[in-house]
């Protein structure tokens, strides 16, 4: 179980009023804020804190979700003719924005090679 604490008394003055997350299952403490000696996100064994007194703080721990091997899909709703016309007449499409690898990008800002690649990948005859 993880609990948040503020150290109120300690033999080490650098620990006074510092904030930590204590993981009782692992016997570890993660520094959230300290005057000196410890840095943010540093993990130490609870025993390294020495003799301390503390007050507990409310902590809302959100569950960590790990997704491995997922898939990614970019959706561009347009016609092939529109992109081909934008390659030949970029001045007609200054605001044409497409999705590439999760990012929105102006089609005209792509190199000619990248534009051809987008057209090839977006419009296929079969899967």
UniProtKB/Swiss-Prot annotation:
Alphabetic keyword roster: Organic radical
PROSITE patterns: GLY_RADICAL_1, GLY_RADICAL_2
Modification type Glycine radical: residues: 102
Gene3D superfamilies: 3.20.70.20
Membrane among keywords: no
GO CC aspect terms: cytosol
Domain Glycine radical: 5-127
Name listed for the protein in its UniProt record: Autonomous glycyl radical cofactor
Ranges that cross the membrane: none
Superkingdom per UniProt: Bacteria
UniProt cross-references to Pfam families, sorted A to Z: Gly_radical
Molecular function as annotated in GO: formate C-acetyltransferase activity
Role of this protein: Acts as a radical domain for damaged PFL and possibly other radical proteins.
Keyword Transferase in annotation: no
NCBIfam families on file: spare_glycyl
């Amino acid at each position: 179980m993880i609990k948040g604490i503020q150290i109120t008394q300690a033999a080490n003055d650098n620990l006074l009023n510092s904030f930590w997350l204590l993981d009782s299952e692992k016997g570890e403490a993660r520094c959230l804020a300290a005057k000196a000696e410890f840095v943010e996100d540093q993990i130490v064994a609870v025993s390294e804190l020495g003799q301390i007194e503390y007050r507990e703080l409310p902590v809302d721990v959100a569950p960590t979700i790990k997704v491995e091997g997922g898939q990614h899909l970019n959706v561009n709703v347009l016609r092939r003719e529109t992109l081909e016309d934008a390659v030949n007449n970029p001045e007609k499409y200054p605001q044409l924005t497409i999705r590439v690898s999760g990012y929105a990008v102006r089609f005209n800002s792509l190199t000619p090679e990248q534009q051809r690649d987008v057209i090839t990948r977006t419009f296929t005859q079969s899967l």
